[in-house]
């Protein structure tokens, strides 16, 4: 088992790994819409969704995978009213079939984020 860290995605905000690689499966921690270079949160749900997915891509690339390897995602949104917007953007990042997914509305996310996305990928 290997803990993954890359500077191409935001550093963990607490005591957890950006991802854990167990050999056949990679478990990615939730990514917010934070710019990895500055730590700044993108403005609005559209920009945050794009950045969260870019951050997941960067973590997966660190272990030689892409979003095409993703089999499951969990999307956390602060407002289910943003569901359609998140879906529209999310759908543009996956080619060759969508992974299984859950979407959950929660009371709050770190740093006041509006969306967080985590994933599980396989080799």
Show which residues each predicted segment covers:
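Short, polar/acidic, helix-capping and beta-turn segments at strand->helix junctions
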Residues: 1-123
């Amino acid at each position: 088992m290997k803990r993954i860290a890359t500077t191409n995605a935001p550093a963990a905000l607490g005591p957890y790994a950006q991802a854990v690689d167990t050999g056949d499966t990679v478990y990615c921690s939730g990514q917010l819409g934070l710019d990895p270079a500055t730590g700044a949160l993108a403005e609005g749900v559209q920009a945050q969704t794009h950045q969260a997915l870019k951050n997941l891509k960067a973590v997966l690339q660190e272990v030689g995978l892409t979003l095409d390897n993703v089999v499951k995602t969990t999307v956390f949104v602060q407002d289910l009213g943003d569901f359609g917007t998140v879906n529209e953007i999310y759908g543009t990042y996956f080619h060759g079939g969508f992974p299984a997914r859950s979407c959950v509305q929660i009371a709050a996310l770190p740093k006041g984020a509006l969306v967080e996305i985590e994933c599980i990928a396989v080799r």
